Swiss-Prot record:
InterPro entries: Ribosomal_bL32 (IPR002677), Ribosomal_bL32_bact (IPR044957), Ribosomal_zn-bd (IPR011332)
Biased composition annotated in UniProt, kind: Polar residues: 21-31
Lineage per the UniProt record: Bacteria, Pseudomonadati, Pseudomonadota, Gammaproteobacteria, Alteromonadales
Keyword annotations from UniProtKB, A to Z: Ribonucleoprotein, Ribosomal protein
Disulfide bonds: none
Protein name (database record): Large ribosomal subunit protein bL32
Source organism of this protein record: Shewanella halifaxensis (strain HAW-EB4)
Length: 56
C-alpha cells in the first residue's frame, strides 16, 4: 500500500484539486421544437435528434 513520505500542505492539496470541479452543462436547441436540452439527452417532450423516441 502506498504511504506518503512527506505531508502535503493545504495549498498543494488545493492546487491539485483546482482542476476537479465540474463545468457547466452543454445545452443544445432541439431542431423540431426549439427547446433547450442537454447534449446527447432526450428532450422533455420525447424527441432525440429530431425523431420521436418516447411516446407518452
Amino acid at each position: 500500500m502506498a504511504v506518503q513520505q512527506n505531508k502535503k500542505s493545504r495549498s498543494k492539496r488545493g492546487m491539485r484539486r483546482s482542476h476537479d470541479s465540474l463545468g457547466t452543462a452543454q445545452l443544445s436547441v432541439d431542431a423540431t421544437s426549439g427547446e433547450l436540452h442537454r447534449r446527447h439527452n432526450v428532450t422533455a417532450d420525447g424527441f432525440y435528434r429530431g425523431q420521436k423516441v418516447i411516446n407518452k
